[in-house]
Every structure is written in C-alpha cells, then in structure tokens.
C-alpha cells in the first residue's frame, strides 16, 4: 500500500470519527416533541421530568438491595437537572439514603418543540403548558373542606370547620360561602370530621392548582337524625356535570358520539308509504326523523316514493295506484287540522245585567210586602186621636165619693210619639221576617 493510499484511509477514518458524534447530536436535536429521559434509564422517556423520574424509579426499585421510595425532579436548567431520589436498605430499613445530584439520575431533554403547537414551554419546570382555560363564573365544583374537630350539641354531631374552602382547579378559581352539601367523620375516627361544599367559579384565573374533590367517610349522625347535614356514604352530593366514582366526585365524561348540535346530525330521512307500498326515497341530507308518507302504492313497488327526508318527518309521497279489491287503500283517520288561535276573551256583562235585574225585582217585592205588613199592623195599632169632634175624650168618674177625670188630651203628644214608634217597630219586624224567609 502506498503512502498516499494510507494517508487517504486515515483521513476518511478521522473524518468518520469526527462526524459520528455530530450525527448523534443532530439526531437528538432533530425536529420533534420534547422528551425527557434519565441518563441510565433509557426506558424512562416521557413528556415531563416527573414522569421520567417515576419510570426510572420503578426500574431501579427492582434492585434486591435497595427500595427506591421516591424520585422527584429537581430542575435547574437543561444541563443541571436531576431526579432527587430516596432509597432504603432492604436488609436494614433504618438505613435511608438520599441523592439530589447523582450522575446516574441526571435528566436530559430531546426534541425541539412541544407536542401541541398551542402549548407553551416552561423552562423552569420543563413542561409544555396548555393555554389558559377560560374560567366561567358560576361553574360548579365539588370540594372537600379541611379535617376539623367534631362538636356534639343536643345529641347531634357537627363539624367545626369554619366554613367553605377555596379551590384552584385547572387554573380557575372557585369559592363562595355555601352551606355544606354533606358532612362525615374521617374514616376510623369519632372526633375528627369534614364537610363537602359545592363551590362556584369566580371567573378569575389562579396559579398552581390547589383542591381536593368531595369524598365520603363514616356517617356523622344516624340517618334518621333531624336537622343535620346529609351523611350518605354513597353520595357526597356531587353537583350537575359531576358523577360519583365510588371514592370521589369526578367530571362526567361527554359522549363523543353525540353531535354538538342536535339539529344537524347525520342520517337518512326515510319515508314509508301507508298505501300498501314501500317508499324507498330516502333523503341523505342530515334529516333526523322518519316520516310516514300518505301516498298509495301497490305492494309490487309500482309506486315510486319520493320521500324528501328533510328531518321534519314528512316522508315520501307514493305515486303508485291502489287496488281496493286487493288492498286497504285507506290512509287512516284524518287528524285535526288548522292551527291554534288565540281564544276570544269572555265578558261578564250579560251575567251582571241578569243579576241586577233580579236584585231590582227582589227590592220591589220586599217593598210591597213591607208596605202590606205595615198597613196591616197600622190598623191594629192606630189610635184615632181625632175622633169625637176634633177633641180627645175626657171621662169623669166617682170613686168612694170622690170625683176623678181622665182626659186623653193631656197625653196627646206622648201618644203621637208612641204611634210613630209602633209603626217603625212593625216595619222592622216585617223586614226581618221577609229576609229570614
């Protein structure tokens, strides 16, 4: 081999040796989503540092000598981030070790962008964060209050928690001052309890999430205890839009098969003729209802259905003929037609006029009967004080040798007043008798 050939081979070898690392570097820097890995654990690749540390911990925990109890990310930029690990000796559990910067637990990142183009990379956490959620005011959120002492009063148990908590869920703030939705004893305790509350969204965003979903515990009071908060072990009082999972309230998942707009689902609107024939003219324009057409058509398909399938259920109109000798050509009883109209308002005028007439007749009848009774009683009680030549009688008599005179004229004024009083009493008595009947 000539010296020139040897030099050429050496040049190629050196060039390859120089290019290989750069090829690996380019591969790690090619376009793709961010992936975090732990140096000594290639299977730990994840979208977040925390997930990568946990995957590596699971693998490391297979060690016969050490029990790796935790591995959490300790972020300090791309070149100086580690998984902080805690591991315990399996032979002697009292031996506990920690390491915040072990070389074998160093984190590194691959890729050059977030998997979701709308996300924003947070350099301090190494996580791609989604855009802020629109926080809706009044949105309901089931939250567990703090564990608090149980107070007994009047034979009933109460939780002295001081009121509803606040919560930050998916960067939205929830609060308010609601009454407890349910209260329980902490499981296994008789002196400590908690209450669940239905908080409402304030419409404001918040920082780090801080919340605990509603949950259940042991019953705070017997079920039949009056004037106490609910304590059903199978229902903490999840609000609409949330469901009981058996341990806590969770968001009720939406059905992806349901259309967002129920007025525009896909489907074939078919029309079925009632004239014995089968109209097959289905309109594939997004109709929702199946309409029954009223057109006739023989059973052999002579009638060509023209169902429009527009979603209103009008169905197809059969254009065929029907033989009454062979088929029932009736289209069925005809339903009510027309449309609803505003009713004509009624009036009480006729009824009022009728009763006014009856009242007037009753007044006249009462007046006639009162007059008749007054005249009758007037004849019984009338004193004709003018009888005797325009002068009241004056009688003289002798008793035991003495003369006495009784002159009615001396009492003319009193008798006249008595006459008027008797007439008035007679009229009142007659009126009472008539009204009683």
UniProtKB/Swiss-Prot annotation:
A GO-annotated cellular component? host cell membrane
Spell out the subcellular localization from the entry: Virion; Host membrane
User: What domain of life?
Assistant: Viruses
Entry keyword annotation includes NADP:
no
Give an example GO biological process: entry receptor-mediated virion attachment to host cell
Instruction: Report the protein's function.
Output: Plays essential roles both in the penetration of the viral genome into the bacterial host via pilus retraction and in the extrusion process. During the initial step of infection, G3P mediates adsorption of the phage to its primary receptor, the tip of host type IV PAK pilus. Attachment of the phage causes pilus retraction bringing the viral particle into close proximity of the host cell inner membrane. Subsequent interaction with a secondary host entry receptor induces penetration of the viral DNA into the host cytoplasm.
Q: What is this protein called?
A: Attachment protein G3P
What organism does the UniProt record list as the source?
Answer: Pseudomonas phage Pf1
Name of the gene: III
């Amino acid at each position: 081999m000539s010296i020139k050939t040897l030099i050429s081979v050496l040049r190629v070898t050196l060039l390859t040796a120089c290019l290989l690392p750069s090829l690996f570097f380019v591969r790690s820097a090619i376009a793709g989503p961010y992936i975090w890995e732990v140096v000594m654990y290639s299977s730990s690749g994840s979208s977040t540092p925390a997930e990568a540390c946990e995957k590596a911990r699971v693998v490391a925990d297979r060690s016969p000598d050490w029990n790796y109890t935790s591995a959490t990310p300790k972020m300090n930029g791309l070149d100086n981030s580690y998984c902080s690990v805690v591991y315990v000796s399996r032979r002697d559990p009292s031996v506990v070790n920690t390491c915040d910067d072990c070389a074998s637990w160093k984190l590194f990142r691959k890729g050059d962008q977030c998997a979701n183009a709308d996300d924003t990379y947070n350099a301090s956490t190494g996580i791609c964060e989604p855009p802020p959620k629109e926080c809706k005011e009044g949105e309901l959120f089931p939250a567990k209050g703090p564990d608090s002492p149980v107070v007994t009063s009047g034979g009933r148990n109460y939780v002295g928690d001081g009121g509803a908590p606040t919560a930050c869920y998916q960067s939205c703030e929830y609060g308010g001052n609601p009454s407890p939705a349910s209260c329980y004893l902490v499981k296994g305790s008789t002196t400590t309890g908690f209450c669940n509350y239905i908080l409402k969204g304030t419409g404001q965003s918040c920082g780090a999430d801080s919340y605990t979903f509603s949950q259940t515990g042991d019953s705070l009071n017997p079920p039949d205890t009056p004037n106490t908060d609910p304590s059903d072990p199978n229902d903490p009082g999840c609000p609409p839009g949330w469901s009981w999972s058996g341990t806590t309230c969770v968001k009720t998942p939406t059905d992806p098969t349901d259309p967002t707009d129920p007025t525009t689902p896909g489907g074939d609107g078919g029309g079925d003729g009632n004239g014995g024939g089968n109209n097959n003219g289905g309109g594939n324009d997004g109709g929702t209802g199946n309409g029954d057409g009223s057109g006739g058509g023989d059973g052999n398909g002579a009638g060509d259905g023209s169902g429009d399938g527009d979603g209103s259920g009008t169905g197809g109109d059969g254009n065929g003929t029907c033989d009454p000798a062979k088929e029932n050509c009736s289209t069925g009883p005809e339903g009510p037609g027309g449309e609803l109209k505003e009713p004509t308002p009624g009036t009480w005028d006729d009824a009022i006029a009728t009763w006014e007439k009856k009242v007037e007749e009753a007044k006249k009848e009462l007046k006639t009967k009162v007059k008749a009774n007054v005249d009758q009683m007037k004849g019984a009680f009338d004193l004709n004080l003018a009888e005797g030549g325009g002068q009241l009688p004056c009688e003289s008599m002798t008793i035991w040798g003495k003369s006495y005179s009784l002159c009615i004229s001396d009492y003319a004024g009193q008798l006249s007043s008595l006459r008027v009083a008797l007439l008035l009493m007679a009229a009142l008595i007659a009126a009472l008798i008539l009204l009683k009947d």
